[in-house]
Amino acid sequence: MPSDFPPGQAGIHARFRVDYPEFSLDVDLRLPGRGVTALFGQSGSGKTTCLRCMAGLAPVSDGYLDINGEVWLDSAARRAVPTHKRALGYVFQEASLFEHLDVLANLRYGMKRVPPALRRVDLEQATGLLGIGHLLARMPAGLSGGERQRVGIARALLTSPRLLLMDEPLAALDVQRKREILPYLERLHDELDIPVIYVSHSPDEVARLADHLVLLEQGRAVASGPLDALLTRLDLPMAMTDDASVVVTGEAAGFDPGYALLTLQLPGGRARLRFVHQAAPAGQRLRVVVHARDVSLALQQPREGSILNVLAVRVLEMAPAANPAHVMVRLDADGTPLLARITRYSRDRLALAPGMQAWAQIKAVSLLA
């Protein structure tokens, strides 16, 4: 089966049909050949099964898998590259380290699979990205859960994979350990040119890490597309959760050292956000997340108040939220999408309707790495 991507354009084509007695997976996905693609869905939706198909660990009734021009599976041609010959890294919920080896020996084990001439990630780069240089002499038994997972990710990177699979790598960690490891995952996103398929049922993780999103329900892909487009679709479940948010990419456009306020120019040209942060070079692209719960609406421009960011918006549509007392409102701020979660009472008091002009008051903005 030929590649479906335009000449010179890399990508991933993953088509799998898997039949179990009580579950079936039937997906046909065309994904970016770089960056992070998140597979999102509830337990039992088929996320891990899809990952196992990519790794060659699940029996596929009919399938095709092309990773940036390298075909690993083609049922029609009776071609199936065995797992140990697929250039992939796999990170599980809990890092499976060799307990009798120190961290350095664990990392070198990952490197042994790759001839020196084919290594795309070296030891210094992997330990630097994951911040584990000071752990090399430690034994796994002396590591925290977050440290173990960072070592496991570094070992996967040292196999110089053409594809990195991550199956809920933060699921086994407590809140503090998740906060510890997320910045390192963001660095991988920014600094490595390896496509990552990231399984999660956490909207917050997806918003922080992903570029592309696939929503799975009962073994079927109900939506697939750029993260920013899918996060604001009110017909999809992610926009209905308590963690509903949007991810906005803008450019650094000024810094006030007296108040440590960074200004971010949004894509539309007129809208800007300000938030407390260190200085950034003018023009540097930055990603921020804005949660729907942190956005309130007013019909008149607020003149006095402590909220820094007040943007002119247009109401696009509304839908009931997961909590029946609330509604979700999709907004446009000069080309920048936003979500607001407000009470039904506020909607009725303001008499909001699609097409209306309003003012969005943004109480918090979180900068992503």
UniProtKB/Swiss-Prot annotation:
Domain of life according to the entry: Bacteria
Q: Name one Pfam family in it.
A: TOBE
Q: What class of enzyme is it?
A: translocase
Where does the protein end up? Cell inner membrane
* UniProt: ATP binding residues: 41-48
Per the record, what are the reactions this protein catalyses?
molybdate(out) + ATP + H2O = molybdate(in) + ADP + phosphate + H(+)
Q: What is an example of a GO molecular function annotated in this UniProt entry? A: ATP hydrolysis activity
Keyword Membrane appears in the UniProt entry: yes
- Known EC number: 7.3.2.5
Q: Quick check: keyword Membrane in the entry?
A: yes
Major subcellular location class: membrane
Domain Mop, residue spans: 304-369
The segment(s) forming the ABC transporter domain are 7-243
| Annotated keywords | ATP-binding, Cell inner membrane, Cell membrane, Membrane, Molybdenum, Nucleotide-binding, Translocase, Transport
Against InterPro entries, the record matches this protein to: AAA+_ATPase (IPR003593), ABC_transporter-like_ATP-bd (IPR003439), ABC_transporter-like_CS (IPR017871), Mo/tungstate-bd_C_term_dom (IPR008995), ModC_ABC_ATP-bd (IPR011868), Molybdenum_import_ModC (IPR050334), Mop_domain (IPR004606), P-loop_NTPase (IPR027417)
- Subunit and interaction comment: The complex is composed of two ATP-binding proteins (ModC), two transmembrane proteins (ModB) and a solute-binding protein (ModA).
Please give the function described in this protein's UniProt entry. Part of the ABC transporter complex ModABC involved in molybdenum import. Responsible for energy coupling to the transport system.
Q: What is the protein's given name?
A: Molybdenum import ATP-binding protein ModC
Q: Which organism is it from?
A: Bordetella parapertussis (strain 12822 / ATCC BAA-587 / NCTC 13253)
